[in-house]
Amino acid sequence: MKYGIESEVCSFADTLGARDGEGESAMGIAEKIKLNYLAFKRLIKEKNSIFCIQRFNYHSFAPYLGHLFLRNKIIFDLDDWEMRENPKYYFGFYPSSKAHFCAREIAKRSVFCISASRFLQHFLGRFNRKVHYLPSGVDTQLFNPAENIPAAEKIVISWIGTFNKMEYIENIDFALRCFVKLRKKHKDIHLDIVGDGIYKDSLVRLVTRFNDSNVRIKDWIAPDEMPIYLRGIQIGILPVRRSNSFNLSKSPTKLFEYMAMQKPTVCSAIGEAMDIVKDGDNGYLACDADMFIKKMGYLIDNSSLRKQMGARARESVEDKYSLGVLCGQFKEILESI
């Protein structure tokens, strides 16, 4: 019970034992149907509950069926693009993307929708007039910088994420190309690539081609341990190569985490970063590779700039993107039903 609203999470992975991460992609249709059946058996006991469907995937069908048969109200919370890039409707009704069709049907039937990005807000707004923008945000109590951070002996630049989409590999390739150019001038800089996913082998081959000993691939780090890692880096980066639906839809959780830890960031001027980062104030925006390199260079050369920009970044997330602020907004939205 928080904020006076009783709630419960039904996670297919944690509650029902479903495979997640890389394991999810190996699941067959029979396994997914069984899990939805188990979830539906739990949900039919909640006759007066509101079902909040968090992102669209195979797990969405159990609460959707609960809505159809039991008339439970539903809320659709979309924080990612889980559909084909450019879906088409043949003859005006037959979809090339079943996920796109199902997502828009769920949106139409929801009492309201939650979007984690402005792009998704516009997408959902085509099917539901009540769409509220709530980004993923960050737990500012967990992601809290140490008061006395020792001076860095080396500059560590960090990219954090998953490798479950080829777009991520493209974005890392962009970052690597920028990094190797910076290394010509700055010999003692290091790049960490942190995460895991089904395209990790592709990432390893990519990094191997660059043949730079100052680039490290690090395993996935648990959320509770992430603040410890982030205390040891100097710069966070959010490179984005292409302006497509997937990249535009992302709510940049790792950007919020960098900012909460008072780390200055350099972000591509694509997608959500453009609404979060004030260029030159609480971070940097870069419109192309040359500008990305230039602004990373500013931060590498100037420790005072890193400190000042990081402090302003922390203020930004405390004001707008902390879980406390966002949960308060969500409570107000729920009370409006």
Named regions from a protein language model:
Residues 119, 137:
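Carbohydrate-associated surface elements
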Residues 37-45, 60-61, 65-69, 76-84, ...:
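Membrane-proximal helix-turn-helix segments that form the acceptor-binding/catalytic region
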Residues 298, 305-320, 326-332:
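A short, well-ordered alpha-helix in the C-terminal region of glycosyltransferases
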Residues 149-183, 192:
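Conserved donor-binding/catalytic core segment of Leloir-type glycosyltransferases
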Residues 111, 230-248, 263:
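Acidic donor-binding loop of glycosyltransferase active sites
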Residues 279-290, 298-304:
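Conserved acidic donor-binding segment of nucleotide-sugar-dependent glycosyltransferases
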Residues 248-249, 269-280, 284-285:
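Short acidic/histidine- and often glycine-rich active-site loop of Leloir-type glycosyltransferases
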Residues 194, 201-228:
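Nucleotide-activated donor-binding/catalytic signature segment of Leloir-type glycosyltransferases, i.e.
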